[in-house]
Amino acid sequence: FVGMIAGGMRIAGQLGGNEKVQLLSGLFIATLPNAVIQASNTESSNIVAFWILAMASLFLDWLKARDRENICKLGCCIGFAILSKGSAYVTAFPFVLAIAFFCLRSPRKLLLQGIAAAAIIIALNAPHLARTYQAYGSIVGGTERNILYHPTPGTLAVNIVYNFLLHEPWLLKGPLLGFWQGLPAALGVDVNDKTIFPWRGLEEYEAQFQVVDTVTQNIIQAILLLAMPVSIILRKFKTPWTYSSLVGATFLLYWIFLTWHPWAGRIHTSMFVLAAPLAGLYINSWPKKWLQKTFVIILLASTFLVFQGGLRRLSIFDSNERNFLYNTRNYLYFNNYKHFDQDYINAVNFLASQHPKSIGLEIYDDSFEYPLWAFMADSVREMPRILHITSQKDRDTLKPEFILALPQGTPELPLAKPHILERKNGEYVKVFPVTEDAASSDKNQQ
């Protein structure tokens, strides 16, 4: 989170912004509700956003120097961004395209640099891509529902509007909701088409300000980003052409190729922080200083609202069990699932006592496996190798010592209790949780 703020401020300086612009850019990120919430959980949105910002900053350095050191660092940042989250393919692509353009325009001087950067990106991701292809038969893994394979002007328009509405729930009240729900049909887009809306449309989105891991709205920042292109069109704001074009292309590619879903807002973090330096320049361009100061106060005040709700609260006056000033991170993992925390802790304690070298992970589409690895890191000297198991063939081929299974729960209890299987005599036998019959059998053997 701190790295994102520093990265945004550095880019603002690279774009010619003074100290005030840099501070405004940092403030834009520091008060971004999505980023604040993601900074205190196990999601990877902030991680990929940091690498994307580092990539953008190094791109500007390389654009000026055209040197090998910066292009190699640039390749590392792109590689780590992609390794952190698949959405980085879209976010980084305009910058990759720009690098390729400049390298091909001066092949004698820059082509080898471009090849070196590409080699670094591939080397960092090759093991993961190979394993993903082995498990799913595709390098995109199980993310097919996130990709819009047949985009049209209609799907683009709907995606732009619906993604903006994710951050402005107040626009989904009363008759406005019916208007937005009717927009896809008016543009020739079938809201029941699962290739376009794999998780249905706006009826699945709760139209209220929320502070949770999957849904947190950037209300103020989204309005500011909408105002920027309007000001550019009206010639009220002159923006750095190269950087703003790349940021705009990132937003455009996202709207064209990624499907909409109610919790897509958390994926927007990378794009919001990329736009932060431009936001700093934009706020600084306002002729009325009182308006700038008022906007800064609004940003700061909105942050307090973020800390007062949701799963993890921050207030010296609030001793609520969700307040992370008074509770450990491990405790806060289970704010929504208090009846499961001990099951996870017991499973980790059991695995740690066995000192495994490898653990197979069998999960369904949306399993809650994050706490397991956080707990495990605190319980063992050396983390075991984690292997994703998707079939019996994987079990036979990879042969992990233990398999940690997180089956799908029920609508009433969405999380199922973890089960652990141990490989014995070539077969996997359930060893946790210990049943009464198994415990009795062990005693008899002893």
Residue ranges and their predicted role:
Residues 20-24, 73-76, 92-99, 114-122, ...:
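Signature aromatic-anchored transmembrane alpha helix within multi-pass, membrane-resident enzymes
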Residues 37-47:
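Short acidic/glycine- and proline-prone juxtamembrane loop motifs at membrane-interface regions
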Residues 113-204:
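Membrane-lumen/periplasm interface segments of specific transmembrane helices
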